[in-house]
């Protein structure tokens, strides 16, 4: 018995929506970064789902989806490390983590 496609796609959309909601409503920079990572995980889940379910109609696209997912994971790791470095610099210079209070990064 095969899992219907709308289960993993729904979960991916839910993860993306939750990440988007959190990134737009939070004021803490670390939380915003975490919600952006949740959004990227939702995108990765949808990529793998489409690869799994449509490999018969387009085998070359099915082979590219895991590679694209690894690329997205690599970019997400780089984005997280740069984002955490910026947040750490913001805390050292301004003493705040809230995005609203840190309007200038000049220091």
From Swiss-Prot:
Keywords: Cell membrane, Membrane, NAD, Quinone, Translocase, Transmembrane, Transmembrane helix, Transport. InterPro entries: NADH_UbQ_OxRdtase_chain4L/K (IPR001133), NUOK/Mnh_C1-like (IPR039428). Its EC number is 7.1.1.-. GO terms for molecular function: NADH:ubiquinone reductase (non-electrogenic) activity; quinone binding. GO terms for biological process: ATP synthesis coupled electron transport. It is a multi-pass membrane protein. The chain crosses the membrane at residues 3-23, 30-50, 67-87. It catalyses: a quinone + NADH + 5 H(+)(in) = a quinol + NAD(+) + 4 H(+)(out). It comes from the Bacteria. Its main location: membrane. GO terms for cellular component: NADH dehydrogenase complex; plasma membrane. It is found in: Cell membrane. It holds the Pfam family Oxidored_q2. It is an enzyme of class 7 (translocase). NDH-1 shuttles electrons from NADH, via FMN and iron-sulfur (Fe-S) centers, to quinones in the respiratory chain. The immediate electron acceptor for the enzyme in this species is believed to be a menaquinone. Couples the redox reaction to proton translocation (for every two electrons transferred, four hydrogen ions are translocated across the cytoplasmic membrane), and thus conserves the redox energy in a proton gradient. Belongs to the complex I subunit 4L family. HAMAP family: NDH1_NuoK (MF_01456). NCBIfam families: PRK05715.1-2. NDH-1 is composed of 14 different subunits. Subunits NuoA, H, J, K, L, M, N constitute the membrane sector of the complex. This is NADH-quinone oxidoreductase subunit K 2. The lineage of its organism: Bacteria, Bacillati, Bacillota, Clostridia, Eubacteriales.
């Amino acid at each position: 018995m095969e899992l219907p496609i709308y289960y993993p796609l729904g979960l991916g959309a839910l993860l993306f929506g939750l990440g988007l909601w959190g990134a737009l409503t939070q004021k803490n920079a670390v939380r915003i970064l975490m919600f952006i990572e949740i959004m990227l995980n939702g995108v990765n889940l949808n990529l793998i789902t489409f690869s799994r379910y449509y490999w018969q109609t387009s085998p070359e696209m099915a082979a590219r989806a895991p590679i694209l997912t690894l690329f997205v994971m690599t970019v997400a790791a780089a984005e997280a490390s740069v984002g955490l470095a910026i947040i750490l610099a913001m805390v050292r210079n301004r003493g705040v983590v809230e995005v609203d209070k840190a309007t200038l990064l000049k220091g």
